[in-house]
Amino acid sequence: MQQLNPSEISEIIKGRIEKLDVTSQARNEGTVVSVSDGIVRIHGLADVMYGEMIEFPGGVYGMALNLEQDSVGAVVLGAYTTLAEGMSAKCTGRILEVPVGKELLGRVVDALGNPVDGKGPLGNTETDAVEKVAPGVIWRKSVDQPVQTGYKAVDAMIPVGRGQRELIIGDRQIGKTALAIDAIINQKDSGIFCVYVAIGQKQSTIANVVRKLEENGALANTIIVAASASESAALQFLAPYSGCTMGEFFRDRGEDALIVYDDLSKQAVAYRQISLLLRRPPGREAYPGDVFYLHSRLLERASRVSEEYVEKFTNGAVTGKTGSLTALPIIETQAGDVSAFVPTNVISITDGQIFLESAMFNSGIRPAVNAGVSVSRVGGAAQTKIIKKLSGGIRTALAQYRELAAFAQFASDLDEATRKQLEHGQRVTELMKQKQYAPMSIADMSLSLYAAERGFLTDIEITKIGSFEQALIAFFNRDHADLMAKINVKGDFNDEIDAGLKAGIEKFKATQTW
């Protein structure tokens, strides 16, 4: 038996050690101290960024939100049932990113951009940061192009422009979502891409929205981001930012996009839940101190950007085109209280609001837009010329009607002028009614407004206004298709169009029935 010399053994071991290739890897790791209600406290992590992704065993990720002296508070993105005390937590050095691009059009994704519609993976997509800084003052352009919602009451009295933030506010179940969905449906041929963000809604409601968009041919140019009521508060809080990043993809490349946040009240509630679980001090209505910043940093990202911005962003690939992201945030009020904390915050951030009223909705006026308190601060400059020209008297007529209607309840004998004003107001109110999922073209809308503005409705019974309008539009689209096409393309109002509309309505009233 051969004897091994100890010195030979040590030489062999030394040789092996020298040849061993070990690369040292510095890792920032900590230990999970507590897990409860989707909030994880981690001890031992150093150099963590606010909003940084933290990796836990089993492919679970969290987001650092509280950076304290000796621990980090993180919110778990998704299920946290597999996490336990004593587990390791690693910094990734990355912030949260979601997929962006045209591959998402027609798809339903969650707050992290994962498809949830059963149509397979998204394919090759770019990713972009969820939290981004809004474009600066120098890169912005004034709002001067319209977004047609297809609603007479909105496009005539509270016009929305590309790059505007227009709040839709009102109590529950009075048509806020219906208004936003119809605005999306109306964009199917306008070249505007749409993003619908559902926050804290029932899954059956989201499924119904998807079905309606598909039935009306608008799903193909819409991205739906769904963070339903069954999702964690963290995902409901993140969903609007994810949707905004997806919309910014189009804005930054010289396209136009429209985003609907349905609704930001539920996002504020989710953020309040996260903040209270992170032991942050509560303020008014138990919301944290930065709830204004929660919404302002989101809504400031909706803007119209200049040609220079688009050219710089695309490295010269796109020139001479402006981009826009128009936001329609929705806020739910309690018993019409617009002076609550979150509604007042969002009203002060946005460029106007469409106020929907329960009393009007219950009396059959739908959409229940209260023209008196609704306003569009920048949309007037973007309004289509013909609509602007014909809608001047509509808002005044409605405002005077509401004032006189209250007065007329107490007065028995009214003079002729007051009676005419009341009757005109009633007819205009009736004309502003519109069915759901039936957005109107510019020409159809112009025709209705022209009939009201020029007194062609004076001899029509109030109960017959709706059927008169439908028959009139059908008649014009059949017998005066060229005139309607010209209005739709140009949107101008001149003597020729004035004469054409007048002659057509006179002929219709003389020869047709309704």
Swiss-Prot record:
Task: Identify the EC number(s).
Answer: 7.1.2.2
Binding residues for ATP, per the UniProt record? Answer: G170, D171, R172, Q173, I174, G175, K176, T177
What InterPro entries does this protein's entry cite?
ATP_synth_asu-like_sf, ATP_synth_asu_C, ATP_synth_asu_C_sf, ATP_synth_F1_a_nt-bd_dom, ATP_synth_F1_asu, ATPase_a/bsu_AS, ATPase_F1/V1/A1_a/bsu_N, ATPase_F1/V1/A1_a/bsu_N_sf
User: From which domain of life does this come?
Assistant: Bacteria
**Gene Ontology MF annotations:** ADP binding; ATP binding; proton-transporting ATP synthase activity, rotational mechanism
Recorded GO cellular component terms are: plasma membrane; proton-transporting ATP synthase complex
Which sequence ranges are marked TM in the entry? none
Per UniProt, the keywords (alphabetical) are: ATP synthesis, ATP-binding, Cell inner membrane, Cell membrane, CF(1), Hydrogen ion transport, Ion transport, Membrane, Nucleotide-binding, Translocase, Transport
**Entry membrane topology:** Peripheral membrane protein
Q: Known catalysed reaction(s)?
A: ATP + H2O + 4 H(+)(in) = ADP + phosphate + 5 H(+)(out)
Q: Where is this site: Required for activity?
A: S374
The entry's function note states: Produces ATP from ADP in the presence of a proton gradient across the membrane. The alpha chain is a regulatory subunit.
The annotated subunit structure for this chain is: F-type ATPases have 2 components, CF(1) - the catalytic core - and CF(0) - the membrane proton channel. CF(1) has five subunits: alpha(3), beta(3), gamma(1), delta(1), epsilon(1). CF(0) has three main subunits: a(1), b(2) and c(9-12). The alpha and beta chains form an alternating ring which encloses part of the gamma chain. CF(1) is attached to CF(0) by a central stalk formed by the gamma and epsilon chains, while a peripheral stalk is formed by the delta and b chains.
UniProt record similarity statement: Belongs to the ATPase alpha/beta chains family.
Protein name from the UniProt record: ATP synthase subunit alpha
Q: Which organism is it from?
A: Pseudomonas fluorescens (strain Pf0-1)
